Amino acid sequence: NFLEMLKENCKLLWKRQKQKFRIPMPESLCQILKKKKQ
C-alpha cells in the first residue's frame, strides 16, 4: 500500500530529524509532506 509506505517514510524521516535537531515531531509538517508527494 503506497499510502502506508508514505506514512512510514514520514515517521522515519521525522525520527531522523528528531535525532539531528532534538525537536518534537510536528504532525502538521508530516501532513504537508504527504500532500506534496500525492
Curated annotation (Swiss-Prot):
Where is it chiefly localized? secreted
Per the UniProt record, which residue ranges are transmembrane?
A: none
Q: Which GO terms describe its molecular function?
A: toxin activity
Cite the entry's keywords alphabetically: Amidation, Secreted, Toxin
Taxonomically, which superkingdom?
Answer: Eukaryota
The compartments listed are: Secreted
Q: Family per UniProt?
A: Belongs to the cationic peptide 04 (cupiennin) family. 10 (double chain) subfamily.
**CC annotations in GO:** extracellular region
Q: Report the protein name in the record.
A: Toxin CSTX-16
Q: Which residues carry this modification: Glutamine amide?
A: Q19, Q38
List the expressing tissues: Expressed by the venom gland.
